[in-house]
Amino acid sequence: MNPEHPMASASSAMPRRTFLKGALSAGASAFFFPRLLAGDPSGGRINLACCGIGNRGGEVVMEFAKTGLVNFVAFCDTDMGAPHTLGVLGKFPDVPRFRDFREMFDTLGKRIDAVTVGTPDFSHFPIAMLAMSQGKHVYCEKPMGQSFRQIALMMEAERKYKVAAQMGNQGHSGANYFQFKAFTEAGIIRKVSRIDAFMNKPRRWHGMKVDGYLPEQPVPPSLDWPDWLSTAQEHSYNKGYMNGEWRSWYDFGNGALGDWGAHIFDTAHEFLRLGLPGEVEAVKLEGWSPYIFPQASTLAFRFPARGGMPPLTLNWYDGLNNFPPLPDGFGGEVVDPNIPPPSAGGKDALKRPTGKVIYGEGLTFKGGSHGSALQIIPSAMAREMESRLPKVPESPSNHVVNFLRACRGEEKCRSSFAVAGPLCQTMSLGVIAQRLNTKFRFDPSTGRITDNAKADALLSGVPPRKGWEQFYAL
């Protein structure tokens, strides 16, 4: 295939399945030897391929462009040329284009050092797995994968192929990361028994009422619908699944929890060493549907005691008016101008609260999302504690620079798959509780749901479509 400026297309004569042989051979060498960057072994720019270049994927492209540390060697999007991809294509008109990531690797794999994955949640897994199996570093938007099993395989691949793999919850390189770490190490945050996390902004499915999947519509000429479906089960095309609308559907997305949980309780999960819960409960679901996410959800994740830390209950609240009880002295929500706007809801969404309350021994904290720093509440207690707080270091790098430096062996990924994986698996368990409107026990030692066979079966997700099974064996 010739990846000239007119897009390399899925209709090319090059066989797309030849990637397996290359994946296995590249993976074997990556396992035993440190891999030099293809672009410049002396330490120059990193050759970057970007999968998903519209909407959030396009924002990721621009974040990497700002670093000045990358060469874009390939763009891949199943809807290449659609309006939401034109911004990136206009800025970088000479970068080779593909609709199919498998053809991209077949054609340009030797030139690629690292890959971004900014596609819908359900399609993260095959792209990331193929990239890692070929020794490519991976920056993957959150959540890592859609099912518990997918996430486990992605963590295993990170270890097996010895690559830098970062999940794109960018606040994990912000002020809250370094503050939470310093506060826990100094004993300021200690013996936490409860966290209330809330995301009460409008979501795309709010107000939706469906009694099945959407009716078939003509596929736009720019879109490769079978490749967009990726590992998902067969569905007829409908524009109601596109451009972020997929987030509404269990078959494609992970709801408000999967979209925002990694921005709200990520640091608590890491530094309180939460791991995986022993019990998950759908406490309240408003407007439950077997197809789309509830209009409002209250979920409880109950974590066992951990090495001197007490049992902890993480309560999750989403929905426009589904707020947690707030402690005295809470005041207003934490507002951080660096937090990106929500993808739906317009200006009103900016006014809706998002954040957390952390109940520790002797102190209570409130925080927002992404990198927003915690505040001790009430304010009188904050003033009393001010002189006793440890110094919090500045971040040496933002999230994408941290990843790029990790590709070069200069830093470690702050949200590596090893760190982000159990967080994403916890959220995937919450989605199972939502989908079945149930409560279940989970055994972290075996990775199985012990008292609900239907829920346990969902740990693996739905079987992949024919022709997509191989990504589970890489």
Would you name each region that the model predicts?
Residues 137-139, 145-227:
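A contiguous active-site-proximal alpha/beta segment in oxidoreductase catalytic domains
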Residues 79-82, 98, 118-123, 144-146, ...:
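Short, solvent-exposed turn/loop segments enriched in Gly/Ser/Thr/Pro and often Arg
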Residues 179, 191, 196-202, 206-418, ...:
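Contiguous beta-strand/loop segments that form the cofactor/metal-binding neighborhood of enzyme cores
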Residues 73, 113, 193:
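Conserved acidic residues
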Residues 5-27:
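N-terminal secretory signal peptides and thylakoid transit peptides that target proteins
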Residues 54, 79, 95-153:
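Beta-loop-alpha module in the N-terminal Rossmann-like domain of NAD(P)-dependent dehydrogenases
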Residues 59-64, 84-88, 125-130, 150-151, ...:
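Short, solvent-exposed loop/turn and secondary-structure capping segments
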Residues 22-92, 171-174, 268:
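N-terminal Rossmann-like dinucleotide-binding module
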